[in-house]
Design a protein with these regions (language model features):
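Conserved, single-site charged/polar hotspot
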Residues: 2-81, 104, 166, 172-178, ...
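Short, glycine-/polar-rich solvent-exposed loops and beta-turns at beta-strand/coil boundaries
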Residues: 109-112
Length: 841
């Protein structure tokens, strides 16, 4: 860490005392006061005087009943280089550290920018942290300035620590003489670490980690790396506000959160030992390794090492020495991995080393994560050392020939099964710990006590299918193609069905679309389902369950409706065909029923990375009317949308559906109950998308649990397709802006809350009724507010259309297009413009 200011070290003594064991000086700021109540300015001579960790006198106070250890200790070991003992802490870096003590990275980045300081550039690394510190009352500026480069004083440092953890034992004795002196970086880091250690004990700051890493590259030795980015032996990190170029090829000890290095604690003077490095080349006394995402070349005079090997070595004065090449490696089918161990088909469970590395080979070696090891694949070579898996090399891309499906219970709510009962329509065999038993058709195999199951249970049909008697599905007791595997975990059973990829679709297609829609419609569903499953396969989102996907709507509904000849034919006729855009398979979104128009995906969902809304719209997921030649005007205009949605006679591909138009009434009490029951959970899930009106008239993202009694509800913004993007809800206690269709549909659920009361009814286009529905059917609706003489809302009439998010393919719309004579290719082009249906295998 390099600081340009000249620093004068002062021998000012600060005693760190436990909370409750010694009182602060009378002139110290009370712990409850925010840091902004005290500000610092440079000494008149133009320099801030630094209180250094070197000058701290520690005092041992009577121990608290919590068993807190002695105050901050100064590490005097010669093997460690203390960082920043004579350097100050900037306000910018203090803001970053304070904010990340209390927030994960996503939460910080999801906050809208509210600061207006003249000296804070929106593009600066510290801007988002200063913004969060301001919003959360941790730090602020004065006179329109934040002074990010100024130093933090002793009093400011203590106030920040008090905000991070008001119950912390970390207290400095503050006097008139030292309160406005700059605190050294080293001292601050030690106090900060102690403070967050106590927080972690309360499970408040559990996302913070202490790591030891070797720095391999930053932009000082790799111009391709943006400033603030580094590559360490454990992978890429960001380290904004810290200069780590001086520590390349050294081991450092840091505090980090979500891949952001918060603080540099110290550097080790001993020669670093590299582990699990991939050998990228060896020639002419030079050894080239690839590690963490960086390629480095070092002097080497040892024996020949084969490219693609994995090794440990010590870096001594720029030379690779004491090289240990891993000799034990194997390939095996991966059944499950959870970050702590991997279970294999033949070798069973093996633990991962603390420094587990993952690489992939191809045109170039790449740094990967454990999630890139696809469940069910056997394309990875694993390297072991001392009984643990130290590294993995993905030698080729896994092929989705089979797919592993985690089976949920009857309710589709959990993966845990209390009891398992299996039979078969034909003979089947069961293998446990290498012992195989054959069962006849109709025989039952029952598991009731997870404690008695120590190994994976394999169940394979010899003929016919396996029937799971212990759960129910839409068509009754489900029968499965492929094999079943059962393990005991956390007092319950997990069940996985391994089945051919195409055979999996045999049961997905009829579960997602009625077979009565016809052959052409089922072919369209088969292609979209295959495209979606393809991306789910490589997303590897269910690896901890030993699966690629699950059988519920979280992935795609599987085997809830029995496969038919029609669904099988649709899958076979389109075998291997997926939708692609610019050569990549797309995740082909689909939904149940449109209101006569689709929505732009960027006007429905926030950006996955930044959480900004609206987001960019994909060129193949755009708003489009559901009838050729129709023009309903600009549906983002409230009057046009109201006229459109109240018209039950619109000529649309979807208009035969009972969900094409719907109507529901909710009283003030029902709306108030629904909003207040769901508001806290939705804010915590997406804080940037729910904003509360502040006293200055500005809506800001702030924690909110209730609006009080509903006063008004109104549409603020609609998308091109007429879908509501932002809703304003005014209550007696709070007024909020709610964005994105899912938040809106969740807050105003048409269902009763609490004891008693009548069921809330949705009236469908065909006269049918649905009661206590889980969500508002769609965000394509308009409202009529019915008020009393005083203007207070008594109830609200919702006129709506469609069912689902409205992005991509409308399944009922497919049926309508088929009936209109449209072909398979025309339907796909209509719903996913610019894509191509291409064979992937």
């Amino acid at each position: 860490m390099k600081i340009k200011k000249h620093i004068i070290l002062m021998g000012i003594i600060c005693a760190c005392l436990f909370a409750g064991c010694a009182a602060l000086d009378k002139k110290e700021t009370p712990p409850q006061q925010a840091a902004q109540n005290e500000s610092s300015s440079p000494d008149k001579e133009g320099e801030n005087l630094v209180v250094s960790a070197e000058n701290i006198k520690t005092e041992t106070a009577p121990a608290k009943t919590t068993g807190v250890e002695s105050p901050v200790q100064i590490n005097a070991e010669s093997s460690l280089e203390t960082i920043g003992d004579n350097e100050p802490l900037s306000r910018a870096l203090a803001a970053k550290m304070a904010v990340l003590a209390l927030n994960d990275r996503y939460s910080v980045e999801s906050l809208e920018r509210e600061i207006t300081y003249a000296d804070c550039d929106e593009g600066a690394w510290y801007d988002k942290y200063v913004n969060a510190a301001f919003i959360q009352g941790i730090m602020t500026g004065e006179g329109g300035l934040f002074r990010p480069d100024d130093n933090i004083t002793i009093i400011e440092a203590q106030n920040i620590l008090n905000i991070i953890n008001s119950e912390s034992s970390v207290k400095m004795r503050i006097t008139d003489e030292n309160r406005d002196k700059s605190i050294s970086y080293a001292l601050w880091v030690q106090l900060y670490e102690k403070c967050i250690d106590e927080l972690e004990g309360e499970n408040i700051s559990g996302g913070i980690n202490k790591k030891s890493m070797i720095v391999l590259a930053d932009n000082s030795n790799n111009s391709k790396l943006p400033e603030g980015n580094i590559i360490a032996d454990s992978g890429p990190f960001t380290a904004f506000g810290l200069k780590l170029g001086d520590y390349v090829d050294r081991r450092i000890n840091v505090i980090e959160r979500d891949g952001e290095i918060i603080a540099l604690k110290n550097a080790e003077n001993a020669a670093p030992r590299f582990s699990g490095a991939y050998i990228a080349g060896w020639e002419d006394g030079k050894l080239t390794i690839f590690l963490g995402g960086a390629e480095r070349t070092y002097e080497y005079t040892g024996d020949t090492i084969e490219k693609g090997s994995i090794c440990d070595f010590t870096l001594q004065n720029g030379k690779a020495e004491s090289v240990n090449v891993y000799k034990d490696s194997f390939k095996d089918t991966v059944k499950l991995h959870n970050g702590e161990h991997i279970e294999f088909a033949d070798r069973g469970v093996l633990p991962l080393s603390e420094d587990f590395r993952v690489y992939s080979e191809g045109s170039a070696v790449m740094w990967r994560r454990s999630r890139n090891i696809i469940i069910g694949s056997d394309t990875v070579r694993f390297f072991t050392s001392e009984g643990k898996i130290s590294a993995a090399v993905i030698e080729s891309v896994a092929k989705p020939e089979k797919i592993r499906v985690a089976i949920k219970d009857t309710s589709f709510e959990k993966f845990d099964h209390e009891r398992v009962e299996i039979t078969g329509t034909g003979q089947f065999k069961i293998r446990i710990e290498g012992m195989e038993t054959t069962y006849e058709a109709g025989d039952r195999y029952v598991l009731e006590n997870p404690e008695h199951v120590k190994d994976r249970v394999y169940i394979e049909p010899i003929s016919g299918r396996l029937v799971m008697e212990s759960i129910k599905r839409g068509y009754g007791v489900p029968a499965y193609r492929g094999s079943l595997e059962i393990i005991a975990k956390d007092g319950a059973f997990l069940i996985v069905n391994e089945v051919g990829f195409e055979e999996y679709l045999y049961s997905v297609v009829p579960s997602e679309m009625p077979v009565s829609y016809g052959a052409e419609a089922l072919k369209v569903q088969a292609v979209t389902a295959r495209s979606y499953a393809y991306n789910q396969f490589f997303a590897n989102g269910f690896s901890e369950y030993g699966a690629n996907v699950c059988d519920s709507v979280i992935s795609q509904v599987y085997n809830n409706v029995n496969e038919t000849e029609s669904s099988i034919k649709a899958v076979n006729d389109t075998e291997g065909i997926c939708l692609t855009y610019d050569g990549s398979v797309i995740s082909a979104n689909f939904f149940s029923t449109s209101a006569g128009i689709m929505a732009n995906n960027g006007e429905v969902w926030a950006d996955n990375s930044t959480r900004k809304f609206p987001a960019n719209t994909s060129p193949y997921l755009v708003s489009k009317i559901q009838q050729e030649g129709s023009d309903y005007g600009n549906l983002s205009i409230e009057e046009n949308m109201a006229a459109f949605i109240k018209n039950n006679n619109i000529k649309s591909y979807d208009n035969f559906s009972n969900w094409f138009r719907w109507y529901v009434e909710m009283t003030n009490e029902e709306l108030t109950a629904s909003i207040n029951a769901n508001l806290k959970e939705r804010y915590e899930a997406s804080p940037r998308l729910i904003k509360t009106l502040q006293s200055d008239g500005v809506f800001r993202s702030r924690p909110v649990e209730s609006i009080g009694r509903l006063i008004n509800i109104e549409v603020i913004k609609r998308g091109e397709g007429g879908n509501i993007m932002t809703l304003k809800i005014t209550g007696e206690e709070n007024t909020i802006l709610v964005s994105t269709e899912y938040n809106i549909r969740t807050l105003i659920r048409p269902r009763r809350y609490g004891e008693g009361g009548k069921a809330i009814e949705i009236k469908l286009a065909d006269g049918g009724i649905r009661t206590d529905y889980g969500l508002m059917p769609s965000a394509f609706f308009t409202m009529e507010r019915m008020t009393d003489a005083s203007g207070e809302i008594q109830y609200v009439k919702f006129y709506g259309g469609g069912n689902g998010h409205g992005v991509g393919m409308s399944q009922t719309g497919v049926k309508g297009m088929v009936d209109a004579g449209k072909t398979f290719d025309e339907i796909l082009e209509h719903f996913y413009p610019g894509t191509a249906a291409e064979k992937q295998w």
